Every structure is written in C-alpha cells, then in structure tokens.
Amino acid sequence: MVSTDSIRQSIQAGLACERVDVVGDGQHFQAVIVSSAFEGRARVARHQLVYAALGDRMREEIHALSMQTLTPAEFALRQHG
C-alpha cells in the first residue's frame, strides 16, 4: 500500500517545494503542493511537473491523486485571505 509520506517524499525529491501536504486512504490521495516552480505556469503545466516528479508511481501505484498546486504567494493569500 502506498503511504502519504512516500508520495510526499517522491514529490519533494523531484520538485523544489516550500510545502507538500498529502492525505489519503492508500489508493486515493489529495495533495496541496506549494512551489516557486509553479510561477507563471498554467494549472495543467503545474500538474505535469508533479506527475514528472512521481514518475512511474503515478501509473503503477497511485490510483487517484487530486492536487492543489500553488505558488508561495497564492498559498499565502489562501492562508490570510
């Protein structure tokens, strides 16, 4: 079974992140990912960066992953907005 910690570690290993929060039940996961690498990128491009960081795990181990991909400024607005 895939753990939330292993998903978080895989994302952090492949993408410079300020914050990665992952919750899930072993098959379906939700993640909030905050990275400066998302600056100036559309949502699809941001998700592609995360998929690249997860590599084969996305096809082989993770059945469903919903993501919120935010820049540090976007995350700060959500926290204080």
Language-model segment annotations:
Residues M1-Q27:
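N-terminal first-folded block
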Residues I7, I11, R46-M58:
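Short, non-transmembrane amphipathic alpha-helical segments
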Residues V23, V32-V34, Q68-L70:
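Solvent-exposed beta-strand sheet faces enriched in polar/charged residues
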Residues Q27, S36-F38, P72:
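Residue-level signature for short turns and capping positions that connect secondary-structure elements
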Residues H28, H47, H63:
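Histidine-centered active-site/metal-ligand motif
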Residues H28-Q30, F75-A76:
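A short acidic, often aromatic-flanked loop/helix-cap motif at beta-alpha or helix-coil junctions
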Residues I33-A45:
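A short interface-forming secondary-structure element
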Residues Y51-G81:
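C-terminal structural segments of small proteins and small subunits
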